Amino acid sequence: MRALATSTYVPTFLAELGLGAMLPLFALSVLRMDHSAAVAAASAVIYAGGRMGGSAWGGSLSARLGPVRAALVGLAALAGGAVVCAVSPVLVPFLAGVALIGFGHAGYHVARQGQVESLVLAVFRARALTTLAGTWRIANFIGPLLGAAVIAAWGLRAAYAFAALTVVAAIVALRASSSWRRRPPRPARSELRHLDVIRSSWPILRTLGLAVLLTGAVRAARIVVIPLWAESIGMSDSAVSLIFAVSAGVDMLLFYPAGAVMDRWGRAWTAVPSTLLIAAGTLLLPFTSGPTGVAIAAVLLGVGNGWGSGVLMTLGADVAPVHGRDVFIGTWMILQDAGGLAGPALISGLAAMTLSTGFFVVGGLGIVTAGALWRWIPPWRPERHLPHAVD
């Protein structure tokens, strides 16, 4: 665990601190450029699209260079994207920066997950991965608070500069650990081909993978629903950032209990309730008209997201093949990111009519997703420490 703390958890905390400051601001930044709510929601689509590319690239790069070196490259891309957003006053270059942020973050995510999985036993897998996810959540709680302070002092763009500095600090912390110097043996080329991995894992990908894609859509939508609705009812930028912090604060309290429940009773005990709670929070938002109501909905979203901490990573680790594991994890992340692309895209498309319509559709999708997870998550066998695959 000491090795994970220095090479994984500390750099992750620093990087996610900056990301937490930026995530609530993508849509708000586009709105400040005098674009519509539909275009603002599309910023989350661009971010998710960048993540899809980063997931595919991150799995292959991690297999070739090892997870630590791949993480350094991902962090460099993430910092570069934050700088681009900080200096871009118009839409197109700003969205390019958002895409680069998504690309670098996903590449880093795949690399970090691979390292944790390689260092822990299966019986402790959920707790190790939820601790990683919990590190993100703690940083995502503090990040919006610091972001709100930076915005109040220096304006919206300064938050992106702050994020770039925290990611650079993560690079320094990772390079200070001894693990980055170790380069693994080069794997066989056949292990690196995404098509081979997809073909051999198709029974899992077309069932549980579909449920993961839907979960990604519901979770990603929560990033845009709060700022868009808050803007529509006249809330300030700093108030939105503070509400995000409240949601993240609830979120971060649940990661370790969620991991313990997964390791003892199975993955479905967190995945299904988590998705239902996110659906409930999304469905509640259109019925709110002030900060108190938005905060209540945000707390529901935070509880749901926190209770599902690390579950998608854990499911991917459970079903990943021995050969081509890094590439499979990248493919698994692509499914999550495809969902992350679909959720905000759905809201963006429906926002042309009314925001509430998009929220109701996403909330209904969350209920369907919970049923899919209940159906396809493999039965848990604690005596085997791993779930059995289902036909």
Predicted regions and their residues:
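C-terminal ends and interior cores of transmembrane alpha-helices
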Residues: 76-89, 277-289
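C-terminal membrane-cytosol helix-exit motif in multi-pass small-molecule transporters
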Residues: 164-185, 370-378
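Helix-loop boundary and gating motifs at the non-cytosolic
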Residues: 1-48, 206-211, 215-229, 233
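Core transmembrane helices of Major Facilitator Superfamily
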Residues: 19, 100-112, 300-312
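Juxtamembrane intracellular "pre-TM" segments in multi-pass secondary transporters
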Residues: 1-2, 179-210, 391
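Helix-to-loop junctions at the C-terminal end of transmembrane segments
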Residues: 54-66, 254-266, 351
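Cytoplasmic helix-loop-helix junction between adjacent transmembrane helices
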Residues: 99-136, 315
